[in-house]
C-alpha cells in the first residue's frame, strides 16, 4: 500500500511539473522517455513482483528516484533561465530594442543622455555678458573730483563757469627722464680732432655758468657721447629749459674749431614736455619782441594756470601775463613768449581759431613789425599746420587734424601704434562716421611729413565739426589736444 501511494505521489508531482512546463512553452525540453511509474513497474516485473522486495531495495529505488527528480529540476531551471535572457543574445537584444522604443535606455542610457547634453551645450551658446564701456588707455585722465563726469559734461561746466578755481590738475605733466630724452639732447658738429668726452663736458658746463644760462647749482650737462669717426657728439642736459638755452652756443670756438650746435634729427618741437627736475618760475612780464604772442577770446572763467596749461602743451614758456581787472577777474586776453623761439609759429598755427566753450581763440604775433629771428622754419605759420590763419581755424572740411597727441617714440612700436589707432577711431566714431584715419609713422632715419599729427576723415562736414567741438582741449596721454580742419585734396594726396 505504501509503495502504491509513493508512486501516486510521484505521478502527481510529475504532472504538476509538466503543466508548468506547458505554460512556459518549453515542453519539448522536458519530455521524459519513461515516467517514474513505468520504471517502478518494470523494476517490479524484473524482480518478480513487489512482495519479495526487501527494505534495502526500496531504499535504493527511492534514492534513484530522488536523483532523477533533482536532475530534471535542474534541467528545467536552466531552460527557463535561457528563455528569460540568461543565455539568449537575440532575446536580450530584442528586449533592449523594446526598452529604447519605450523611452528607456538600459545601461547605456545615462551615457547617451550625457552625450546629448554635451552636444546641446555646444549648440546653445552661453548668454553673453553685457559689454562694459571701454576704458581707454590714452583719453582723458579726469581732474580730481570729476572722476564720474564725462568729458562733454566737464567742458559744458567749464563753459558755464561752474568749475571752481583750482580744480584743474597741475599744468606740469608727470613724465620721467626717458620720455624727455630727445628734448634734452643737442647735436654738436665739427668737433676738433683728438678731443675727449670729459674735456667737452667740462667746457660746456663752464660756459653755461659763465653765461648765466645754468638755472640751478651743479652741472647742467650730464652726459657727452663722441663719435670720432664722423666728427660729431651729443650732449645731454638735465632739463629742457637749459637744453634750449644751450643752443646759444652755436658757433662757439672750442680748441680752435667753430662748433655747430643743433637740435637732434628726432626732435619734435610740438611734442616738447616739461622735465620734472626743472620747475623754474615763468616771468610775469612779457617784453616786446618778435616772438611775443597775443592770445584773445579767452573765456573769463579760465584761470591763469588753465591758460598756461593750454599754451604749455607746445613747450615751456619764458614769460606769460594774463590781463585781469581790479577784482582779479580775467579780461579775456593774455600775452606770452616761449622759451624756444621755434615754437612760436607752431603754437599760433595750432591755437588760433580753437573753440573754448562758447568762444573762439584769436592767437597771433603781438609785435608784427618786429624783425623775426631766423627759426629755420617757414615764414608763414600756415605752412606749418596746413591751415589758413586768416580764416581762424580755417574753413570746415571733412578732414580733422589732431595735434599734440602722440610722440615719435610712441609710434615706433607696432602694438602701441595699433592701440593708438583703435583709441582714436573709437572716440571719433562717437561724433560721426569715420571714413579713414591716418597717423604718419617715422621710418628709420628718413624724415616723414606729418609725424606727430593725426588725420581723421569723416563722412560729412557736420560730423567733422561735431568732433572738432568735442575733442578740442581734451586730454590724450596727458597732453592737451589741439585741432584744426585740413584741406581735403592735401589729405588724399598725402601732403601731410
UniProtKB/Swiss-Prot annotation:
InterPro entries, A to Z: Nucleotide-bd_a/b_plait_sf (IPR012677), RBD_domain_sf (IPR035979), RRM_dom (IPR000504), U2AF_lg (IPR006529)
Stretches with biased composition (Basic and acidic residues): 1-26, 78-96, 105-138
GO MF annotation terms: poly-pyrimidine tract binding; pre-mRNA 3'-splice site binding
GO biological process: developmental growth; embryo development ending in birth or egg hatching; embryonic body morphogenesis; germ cell development; mRNA 3'-splice site recognition; nematode larval development; regulation of mRNA splicing, via spliceosome; spliceosomal complex assembly
Alphabetical list of Pfam families matching this protein: RRM_1
Region listing for Disordered, in residue ranges: 1-142
Domain RRM stretches: 184-266, 291-368, 404-488
Biased composition (Basic residues): 59-77
Keyword tRNA processing among UniProt keywords: no
Location of the protein in the cell: Nucleus
SUPFAM superfamilies: RNA-binding domain, RBD
Record keywords: mRNA processing, mRNA splicing, Nucleus, Repeat, RNA-binding
Gene Ontology cellular component terms for the protein in this record: commitment complex; nuclear speck; nucleoplasm; spliceosomal complex; U2-type prespliceosome; U2AF complex
CDD domains: RRM1_U2AF65 (cd12230), RRM2_U2AF65 (cd12231), RRM3_U2AF65 (cd12232)
Residue spans crossing the bilayer: none
Keyword Repeat in record: yes
Subunit structure: Forms a heterodimer with the U2AF small subunit.
Function (record text): Necessary for the splicing of pre-mRNA. Binds to the polypyrimidine tract of introns early during spliceosome assembly.
Protein name: Splicing factor U2AF 65 kDa subunit
Taxonomic placement: Eukaryota, Metazoa, Ecdysozoa, Nematoda, Chromadorea
Gene behind this protein: uaf-1
Amino acid at each position: 500500500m505504501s509503495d502504491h501511494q509513493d508512486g501516486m505521489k510521484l505521478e502527481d508531482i510529475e504532472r504538476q511539473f509538466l503543466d508548468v512546463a506547458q505554460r512556459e512553452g518549453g515542453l519539448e525540453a522536458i519530455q521524459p522517455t519513461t515516467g517514474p511509474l513505468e520504471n517502478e513497474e518494470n523494476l517490479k516485473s524484473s524482480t518478480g513482483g513487489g512482495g519479495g522486495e526487501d527494505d534495502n531495495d526500496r531504499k535504493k529505488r527511492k534514492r534513484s528516484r530522488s536523483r532523477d527528480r533533482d536532475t530534471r529540476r535542474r534541467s528545467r531551471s536552466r531552460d527557463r533561465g535561457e528563455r528569460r535572457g540568461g543565455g539568449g543574445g537575440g532575446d536580450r537584444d530584442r528586449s533592449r530594442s523594446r526598452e529604447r522604443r519605450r523611452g528607456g535606455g538600459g545601461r547605456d542610457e545615462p551615457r547617451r543622455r550625457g552625450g546629448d547634453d554635451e552636444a546641446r551645450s555646444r549648440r546653445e551658446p552661453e548668454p553673453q555678458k553685457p559689454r562694459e564701456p571701454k576704458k581707454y588707455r590714452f583719453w582723458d585722465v579726469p581732474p580730481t573730483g570729476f572722476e564720474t563726469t564725462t568729458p562733454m559734461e566737464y567742458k559744458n561746466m567749464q563753459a558755464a563757469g561752474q568749475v571752481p578755481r583750482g580744480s584743474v590738475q597741475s599744468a606740469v605733466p608727470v613724465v620721467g627722464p626717458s620720455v624727455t630724452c630727445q628734448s634734452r639732447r643737442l647735436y654738436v658738429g665739427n668737433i676738433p680732432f683728438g678731443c675727449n668726452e670729459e674735456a667737452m663736458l667740462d667746457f660746456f658746463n663752464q660756459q653755461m655758468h659763465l653765461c648765466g644760462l645754468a638755472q640751478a647749482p651743479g652741472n647742467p650737462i650730464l652726459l657727452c657721447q663722441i663719435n670720432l669717426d664722423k666728427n660729431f657728439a651729443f650732449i645731454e642736459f638735465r632739463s629742457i629749459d637749459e637744453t634750449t638755452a644751450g643752443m646759444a652756443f652755436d658757433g662757439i670756438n672750442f680748441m680752435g674749431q667753430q662748433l655747430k650746435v643743433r637740435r637732434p634729427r628726432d626732435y619734435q618741437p610740438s611734442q616738447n614736455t616739461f622735465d620734472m627736475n626743472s620747475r623754474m618760475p615763468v616771468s610775469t612780464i612779457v617784453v616786446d619782441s618778435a616772438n611775443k604772442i597775443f592770445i584773445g577770446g579767452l573765456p573769463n572763467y579760465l584761470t591763469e594756470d588753465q591758460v598756461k596749461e593750454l599754451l604749455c602743451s607746445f613747450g615751456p614758456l619764458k614769460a606769460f601775463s594774463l590781463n585781469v581787472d581790479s577784482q582779479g577777474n580775467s579780461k579775456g586776453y593774455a600775452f606770452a613768449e616761449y622759451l624756444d623761439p621755434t615754437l612760436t609759429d607752431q603754437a599760433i598755427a595750432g591755437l588760433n581759431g580753437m573753440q573754448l566753450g562758447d568762444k573762439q581763440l584769436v592767437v597771433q604775433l603781438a609785435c608784427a613789425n618786429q624783425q623775426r629771428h631766423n627759426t629755420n622754419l617757414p615764414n608763414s605759420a600756415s605752412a606749418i599746420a596746413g591751415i589758413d590763419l586768416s580764416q581762424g581755424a580755417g574753413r570746415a572740411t571733412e578732414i580733422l587734424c589732431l595735434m599734440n597727441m602722440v610722440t615719435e617714440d610712441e609710434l615706433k612700436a607696432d602694438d602701441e601704434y595699433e592701440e593708438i589707432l583703435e583709441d582714436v577711431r573709437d572716440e571719433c566714431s562717437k561724433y560721426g562716421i569715420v571714413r579713414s584715419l591716418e597717423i604718419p609713422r617715422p621710418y628709420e632715419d628718413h624724415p616723414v611729413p606729418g609725424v606727430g599729427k593725426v588725420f581723421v576723415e569723416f563722412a560729412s562736414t557736420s560730423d567733422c565739426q561735431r568732433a572738432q567741438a568735442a575733442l578740442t582741449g581734451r586730454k590724450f596721454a596727458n597732453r592737451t589736444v589741439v585741432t584744426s580742419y585740413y584741406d581735403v585734396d592735401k589729405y588724399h594726396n598725402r601732403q601731410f
